[in-house]
């Protein structure tokens, strides 16, 4: 949050949820869209048969080729160019089998150094291509198998091959580096340290001028360069932003998906990172992609927009000014639970803004859908909807709070007081207390806090009293303050709620697994 929001919240007489929690960044154990199958499975990719080639019977090929390994090794180590190409191609075909390719068996033959050597043979591009293809598939294996490729010096020569005059060799080098970078953050940073990014970006400067397959593979590799925790050095990967700003307009779904994922990784972090993403002029198109018919595109687009609105109010307003709210309203009704959850999280960071931004959420007719999810959705979504409503009560005007109450937010907030997650109990208490604060101001004019009766009708008073003995210190303090400040008349009616001699021990427990 920026300074003005902190000052506003500090000026309130009560102790509220810590001010820097109102707007919530994504953390390792945080709320996130579960990686979709494509993202998970394609951190590494194996090149398989050439399109149009005859399908190979897996079992017969493996058995045949494994029997021939000694002779193939002899041929690949010969000085005969024809035999070298023939045996390298045979190894490539063996490694291109779709299911359970014998990567380990090939590594054990000791041919990897020889394959790397072939990459340097500029006057033999067909051999370069076959060797690069074989090494790409070895690098698609386990971390140990990828390490064999790295330890034999392949990264350096693959980076050189990004500038090869031969299209197929360049594309295979792109693919290989994507597989190596996709192995781990260590491998990713190793590839980046070999200065692989500039020639890759050079390939993508004019996407319309190169083959679609190259654009797809290069964008996928670029996405792998940007992904992972710990994050890659931003001073290196920030150079990707102008290229990604072009790629999100490319008319190919695979390219869109990977370009959006790359932007989601780059926008995840400090306000300074967020500003650089905004300055790349991607917000309007990313908001437009929230309405893409394919969920695989919506997902990273929403992740990116969600990251941007974790920034300050001005950064959030950039997103609102390009009509994000109408798309977010639609996403609250997505058939995908993960999308609904992330949309709620995104809205919660918007309602952590100023009163004008809260009004924009109200005007977009989002509150009824939020309240519905708060009352009826799965608990993971309810938590995010609770943050969205609670943040709106913290930063909203009395009129805005009145509107929230009129939409039925009180009962589902009260119902959350019975859950086991202390963090969400405190979020719900925060919302309830903010509503009572607004009601107390109204009572100064009318003599009656209108919201106390609504909370009572929602069985909120009993739930609040039940929390007096909660072991979480923050919960106890909030409940004690609510009772003493707003519910004293009920306390007198019911007698001593805290008998003399009672003692409480508090644990400063927080739910480390809570999705922030």
From Swiss-Prot:
Keyword flag Transport: yes
Classification via Pfam families: Arm (PF00514), Arm_3 (PF16186), IBB (PF01749)
Main subcellular location: cytoplasm
UniProt GO cellular component terms: cytoplasm; nuclear envelope; nucleus
Keywords from the UniProt entry: Cytoplasm, Nucleus, Protein transport, Repeat, Transport
Source species, domain of life: Eukaryota
GO biological process entries: NLS-bearing protein import into nucleus
Biased composition (Low complexity): 502-516
Database matches in PROSITE patterns: ARM_REPEAT (PS50176), IBB (PS51214)
Domain IBB: 1-55
ARM repeat ranges, renumbered to this chain: 55-96, 100-140, 143-182, 185-227, 229-268, 271-310, 313-352, 355-394, 398-437
Annotated stretches, region: Disordered: 1-54, 490-516
Bias-annotated ranges (Basic and acidic residues): 1-29
Compartments reported by the entry: Cytoplasm; Nucleus envelope
Record keyword Nucleus present: yes
Molecular-function GO term, any one: nuclear localization sequence binding
InterPro entries in alphabetical order: ARM-like (IPR011989), ARM-type_fold (IPR016024), Arm_3 (IPR032413), Armadillo (IPR000225), Importin-a_IBB (IPR002652), Importin-a_IBB_sf (IPR036975), Importin_alpha (IPR024931)
Function according to Swiss-Prot or TrEMBL: Functions in nuclear protein import via a substrate-importin alpha-beta transport complex that passes though the nuclear pore complexes (NPC). Binds specifically and directly to substrates containing either a simple or bipartite NLS motif.
Subunit-structure text: Forms a complex with tnpo/importin subunit beta.
PANTHER family (UniProt xref): IMPORTIN ALPHA
Family membership: Belongs to the importin alpha family.
Record's comment describing the protein's domains: The N-terminal hydrophilic region contains the importin beta binding domain (IBB domain), which is sufficient for binding importin beta and essential for nuclear protein import.
Protein name: Importin subunit alpha-B
């Amino acid at each position: 949050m920026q300074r003005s929001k902190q000052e506003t919240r500090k000026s309130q007489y009560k102790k509220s949820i810590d001010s820097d929690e109102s707007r919530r960044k994504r953390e390792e154990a945080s709320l996130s869209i579960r990686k979709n199958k494509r993202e998970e499975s394609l951190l590494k990719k194996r090149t398989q048969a050439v399109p149009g080639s005859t399908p190979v019977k897996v079992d017969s090929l493996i058995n045949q080729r494994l029997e021939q390994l000694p002779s193939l090794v002899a041929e690949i180590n010969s000085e005969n160019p024809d035999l070298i190409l023939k045996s390298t191609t045979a190894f490539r075909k063996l490694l291109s089998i779709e299911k359970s390719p014998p990567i380990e068996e090939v590594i054990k033959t000791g041919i990897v150094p020889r394959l790397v050597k072939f990459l340097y043979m500029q006057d033999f591009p067909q051999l370069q291509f076959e060797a690069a293809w074989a090494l790409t598939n070895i690098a698609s294996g386990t971390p140990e198998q990828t390490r064999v490729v790295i330890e034999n010096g392949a990264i350096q020569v693959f980076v050189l091959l990004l500038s090869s005059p031969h299209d197929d060799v360049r594309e295979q080098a792109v693919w290989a580096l994507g597989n190596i970078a996709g192995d781990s953050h260590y491998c990713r940073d190793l590839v980046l340290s070999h200065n692989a990014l500039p020639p890759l970006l050079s390939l993508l400067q004019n996407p319309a001028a190169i083959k679609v397959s190259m654009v797809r593979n290069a964008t996928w590799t670029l996405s792998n360069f940007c992904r992972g925790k710990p994050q890659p050095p931003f001073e290196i990967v920030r150079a990707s932003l102008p290229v990604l700003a072009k790629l999100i307009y490319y008319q190919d779904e695979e390219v869109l998906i990977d370009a959006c994922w790359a932007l989601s990784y780059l926008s995840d972090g400090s306000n300074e990172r967020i500003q650089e993403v905004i300055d790349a002029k991607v917000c309007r198109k990313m908001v437009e992609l929230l309405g893409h018919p394919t969920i695989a595109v919506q997902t990273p687009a929403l992740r990116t927009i969600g990251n941007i609105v974790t920034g300050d109010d001005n950064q959030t307003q950039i997103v609102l000014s390009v009509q994000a709210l109408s798309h977010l309203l639609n996403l609250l009704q997505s058939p995908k639970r993960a999308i609904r959850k992330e949309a709620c999280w995104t809205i919660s960071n918007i309602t952590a803004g100023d009163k004008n931004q809260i009004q924009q959420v109200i005007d977009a007719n989002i509150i009824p859908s939020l309240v519905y999810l708060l009352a009826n959705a799965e608990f993971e979504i309810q938590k995010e909807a609770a943050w969205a409503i609670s943040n709106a009560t913290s930063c909203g005007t009395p009129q805005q709070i009145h509107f929230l109450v009129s939409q039925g937010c009180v009962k589902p907030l009260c119902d959350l007081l019975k859950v086991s997650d202390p963090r969400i109990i405190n979020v719900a208490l925060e919302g309830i207390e903010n509503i009572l604060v607004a009601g107390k101001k109204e009572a100064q004019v009318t003599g009656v806090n209108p919201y106390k009766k609504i909370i009572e009708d929602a069985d909120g008073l009993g739930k609040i009293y039940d929390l007096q003995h909660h072991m979480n210190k923050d919960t106890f303090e909030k409940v004690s303050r609510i009772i003493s400040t707003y519910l004293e008349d009920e306390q007198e009616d019911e007698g001593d709620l805290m008998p003399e001699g009672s003692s409480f021990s508090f644990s400063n427990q927080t739910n480390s697994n809570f999705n922030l």
